């Protein structure tokens, strides 16, 4: 939590958390908290989701019930179109050295995803904003894949003894969300 003012009942600075990394991870600190404190310990809810302070998925209770009835795995926001492709988009928000660090982390940890990523970067669709509603197991699997990549990216991109205060991990997370769900779309 970046503020002492209480604005919600549940915060990302209790239990197992990375709340102090919020300046870089943005809303992904809340996803980490959900993964470690809800997805891994409770078996009550079938679906979990992440919205954040100014971004949310506009879905009604009836829509959620229909998702459950139709056994929908994942709900993502409409993808944003970036012409000519999403590789152009990331250069506005992400330093090339950080992008290269993420690609290196992918190659080290998940080489099959790294190979597919080059293909996905050439298409125009990006699922922005790190927003999702998904079945428990799918979201848990995504987190188990995502956070080791982000941790390794941080190790490769942050010079020793230097503290960063930008949103680069959050922006990289948007690209990784797109990769993960495009990779698993088939």
Predicted regions and their residues:
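ER/Golgi luminal nucleotide-sugar-dependent glycosyltransferases, focusing on the catalytic module
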Residues: 1-186
């Amino acid at each position: 939590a970046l503020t002492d003012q209480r604005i919600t009942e549940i915060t990302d600075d209790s239990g197992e958390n990375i709340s102090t990394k919020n300046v870089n991870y943005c809303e992904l600190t809340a996803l980490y908290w959900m993964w470690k404190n809800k997805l891994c310990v409770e078996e009550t809810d079938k679906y979990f989701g992440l919205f954040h302070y100014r971004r949310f998925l506009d879905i009604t209770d009836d829509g959620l019930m229909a998702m459950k009835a139709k056994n929908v795995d994942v709900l993502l926001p409409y993808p944003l179109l970036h012409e000519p492709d999403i590789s152009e988009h990331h250069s506005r928000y992400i330093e090339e050295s950080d992008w290269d660090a993420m690609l290196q982390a992918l190659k080290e940890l998940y080489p099959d995803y790294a190979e597919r990523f080059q293909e996905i970067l050439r298409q125009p669709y990006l699922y922005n904003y790190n927003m999702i509603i998904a079945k428990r197991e799918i979201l848990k699997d995504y987190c188990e894949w995502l956070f080791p990549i982000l941790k390794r990216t941080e190790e490769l991109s942050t010079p020793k003894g230097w503290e960063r205060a930008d949103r680069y991990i959050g922006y990289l997370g948007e690209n990784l969300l797109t990769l993960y769900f495009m990779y698993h779309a088939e």
